[in-house]
């Protein structure tokens, strides 16, 4: 599956990316190369291969789940333009 220029323009619009006319050919080629690599990986027969969660058989040493830092939320929120009930208020960017 190869992407056309119009596909890349639509993807850029949906992702809110500003691509210049000069960037479109290079971006289209890069995305097509990525999709080609994905096609190659999907073509490999892995029917006899067990799923692998991690390449190394190692045990993770996890630290205890304990609070190690003090709460600085109030100090950080004093410089925020708008805060309500401990949450930062930001302008709406996605229209419904």
Curated annotation (Swiss-Prot):
UniProt-listed InterPro entries: Asp/Glu-ADT_sf_sub_c (IPR036113), GatC (IPR003837)
Keywords: ATP-binding, Ligase, Nucleotide-binding, Protein biosynthesis
Keyword Ligase: yes
Keyword ATP-binding on entry: yes
GO biological process terms held by the UniProt record: glutaminyl-tRNAGln biosynthesis via transamidation; regulation of translational fidelity; translation
Family matches, as SUPFAM superfamilies: Glu-tRNAGln amidotransferase C subunit
Known EC number: 6.3.5.-
Catalytic activity as recorded in UniProt: L-glutamyl-tRNA(Gln) + L-glutamine + ATP + H2O = L-glutaminyl-tRNA(Gln) + L-glutamate + ADP + phosphate + H(+); L-aspartyl-tRNA(Asn) + L-glutamine + ATP + H2O = L-asparaginyl-tRNA(Asn) + L-glutamate + ADP + phosphate + 2 H(+)
Superkingdom of origin organism: Bacteria
Record GO terms (molecular function): asparaginyl-tRNA synthase (glutamine-hydrolyzing) activity; ATP binding; glutaminyl-tRNA synthase (glutamine-hydrolyzing) activity
Function recorded in the entry: Allows the formation of correctly charged Asn-tRNA(Asn) or Gln-tRNA(Gln) through the transamidation of misacylated Asp-tRNA(Asn) or Glu-tRNA(Gln) in organisms which lack either or both of asparaginyl-tRNA or glutaminyl-tRNA synthetases. The reaction takes place in the presence of glutamine and ATP through an activated phospho-Asp-tRNA(Asn) or phospho-Glu-tRNA(Gln).
Protein family: Belongs to the GatC family.
Self-association state and partner proteins as the record states: Heterotrimer of A, B and C subunits.
Protein name as catalogued: Glutamyl-tRNA(Gln) amidotransferase subunit C
Organism (species): Pseudomonas aeruginosa (strain ATCC 15692 / DSM 22644 / CIP 104116 / JCM 14847 / LMG 12228 / 1C / PRS 101 / PAO1)
Lineage: Bacteria, Pseudomonadati, Pseudomonadota, Gammaproteobacteria, Pseudomonadales
Gene name per UniProt: gatC
């Amino acid at each position: 599956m190869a992407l056309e220029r119009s596909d890349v323009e639509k993807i850029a619009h949906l992702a809110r990316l500003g691509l210049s006319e000069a960037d479109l050919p290079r971006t289209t080629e890069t995305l097509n190369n990525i999709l080609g690599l994905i096609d190659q990986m999907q073509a490999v027969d892995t029917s006899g291969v067990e799923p692998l969660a991690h390449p190394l058989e190692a045990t993770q040493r996890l630290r205890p789940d304990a609070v190690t830092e003090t709460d600085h939320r109030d100090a950080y929120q004093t410089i925020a333009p708008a805060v309500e009930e401990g949450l930062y208020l930001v302008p709406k960017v996605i229209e419904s």
